[in-house]
Amino acid sequence: MHIAVCIKQVPDSAQIRVHPVTNTIMRQGVPAIVNPFDLFALEEALRIKDATGATVTVLTMGPPPAEEALRKCLSFGADHAILITDKVFSGADTLATSFVLASALRTLNERQPLDLIFTGKQTIDGDTAQVGPGIAIRLGYQLLTYVSKIRELDPAARRLVVERRAEGGVQVLQSALPAVITMLEGGNEMRFADMPGMFRAARQEVEIWNRDGAGITDLTQVGLKGSPTAVAQVFGPKPKAVKAQRIEGATPAEMAEAFVDKLFADFPQLEGELLAHLDQLAGQDSGLAAPQGESA
Amino acid sequence: MEKFDVIVVGAGPAGNGAAYTLAKAGLSVLQLERGESPGTKNVQGAILYADALEKIIPDFRETCPLERHIIEQRMWLMDEDQTCTGMSYRDARFSQEPYNRYTIIRARFDRWFSDQVKKAGALVVCETTVTELLRNGSGKVIGVRTEREKGDIYADCVILADGANALVGSRAGLRPEITADDMALAVKEVLFLPKETVDARFNISGTQGVVIEIAGNVTHGMLGTGFLYTNKDSLAIGIGCMLSDMKKQSLTPYQLLEGLKRHPTIKPLIEGAEMKEYSAHLIPEGGYKALPQLYGDGWMIVGDAAGFVNAVHREGSNLAMTSGRMAAETLIALKAAGKPYSAANLAAYKRTLDDSFVMADLKKYQDVPTLLTEQPHMLGMYPRFLGDAARELLTVDGVSKRAKQQKIMADLKGKRSLLGLLGDAYRFWRAFR
Ligand SMILES: Cc1cc2nc3c(=O)[nH]c(=O)nc-3n(C[C@H](O)[C@H](O)[C@H](O)COP(=O)(O)OP(=O)(O)OC[C@H]3O[C@@H](n4cnc5c(N)ncnc54)[C@H](O)[C@@H]3O)c2cc1C
């Protein structure tokens, strides 16, 4: 079995510090990490490797420093690492990124056929969740998004069963291989690399692929040129200058009453609208909706 | 089992100086660093003294990320919130290449230095903390234990370059634990300003830079100093005090720094700057008298871990790099001679240090820490007096100059007896001669 895991190096938003006196955000010196969601994907791949002896290849499209993130993956136990880097790739949105990754994965597939491709659910710096699906569509693989758990994997029958979080519940899905899986957080926990892993990561060669290495000829589809989306503006929500109010009362019932009184006092039209709505409901259900106490 | 000629613990200037020199000479070197990458945890003003680095990497100027070369040094005595009495030295020769001192940004510098170490052939492993030393039956250090699984690694010699806390050596009983009396706590901020603004405010251009060292009552009577350095498009400002003093006072280091930034002499210089970074770090300032045993069977201590800091001149990184290099050269020579890394053989490291500026400078100022701890008025009273005297002389108000001088002397005598003044002068001369 051959599994590819696509990762991204991102700034560690948890380590963006706030100055203790002035409360301003300190942007400098924020370390780069492997996108946390990707680590769930990698750990899932490594568990399959532990169980089946699969080969795990990690890859990322990014600037040269992203090599560090790949080495980190090697320290956890990935077998190979490929950095896909080229000046023409910069400024890529998710469409262009999935184009480059899909091309590289096609090349990788020729070297050793791929059975599974993992990505994280999304990145913490973009939050789009579009790259995994983009890869699946481009490669024509099965797509399984928001997967929380792999229940069964049968490489011989080329089949797997996963749990997928969906609105209102969990779906259990069976799929054929090859497939692209985008992993949810929390289903596993990344291992702590042991010392031999650290040595391997420090010593092993990270392969560097430029556009030729990744098998890319159509430069209109990559980088800024291949990116139809542009971020027009980024802004934080304005904090509202409204103070919290305290509602007092001896019992919960009293407090609730005081709260409702206050609400109606502050929003006078609310009382009328609510009553009108209740009347309407009562009319529709012809008595059935009446509170139990009254009907008794 | 992994086995190396040498394991270097820590990737600051001391560890990098050692690892680079060793790897260049062909020894097998493993360097372990607990930070995510070299430099993420390290703090410095930061002034780089070219000489120390040049002796390790002669052509460092070609690739090293340097900010500005220093052409002017200002020494300011300041009170808490009003006055500043200063002296400055600018020298056109400081602008002739090769430059002697530079401002640097440690995070970038350490990363660059570490890249050179890797290129020289050392194996560098980050995010790995050394927890203890491994020893054989006769007590010789034979390797380190890390916090990772299967984490024991062996070497013929371990160089401890783990910085001010020196935990590894203390834990192994190789050196006493560091006390608050020998330790300063410094805080520092990097403030962004456009290059043109820095140039205009400090009367410099190109890559010229200015260094301001600050003493006096800005530390609110505690033993310590402040600084303001010019980077390319930022300023580094910081203040540090002895940890024992800080413990006694209720002021936090951040409050001290905020006070310094509000001082009317500093404020216009940093006006409108955007803070990019703040950090806090310990500085071992015990000086010569606080130096521990520096070597033993299979181990050596270098840099801040050994307490190699010249607090009077705010030199640390150069002593760190130099001691790292000397430790490495000791090992290289022994290996070439086919001699083991026994305590008796490693004593050569101490002898080299003794013959160098490292020990000479530390010895020279060995009485300064005690002087300033025992005579705290040296820091508080004199700066204030100087300020008062200057104000008196410079205020033109119809009072004769002679009368003003008499008033100044009377003020001084009111603060301290004539004998006290003489005693201070003598102590000062003794400590700095
Ligand atoms: C605010 C401030 C301003 C300063 N200004 C100047 C200046 O202008 N010029 C100057 O020359 N000096 C200055 N110094 C002093 C200078 O920073 C130090 O002397 C110098 O950094 C010492 O280098 P080092 O390599 O010994 O220690 P460090 O730079 O502290 O490096 C130690 C390294 O060891 C690592 N480490 C620690 N424990 C372990 C462990 N158990 N396992 C693995 N790794 C470990 C740390 O993460 C760190 O990377 C200043 C210091 C401060 C705090």
Regions found by a protein language model. Give the residues of each.
Chain A
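N-terminal glycine-rich FAD/FM-binding segment characteristic of electron-transfer flavoproteins
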Residues: 1-296
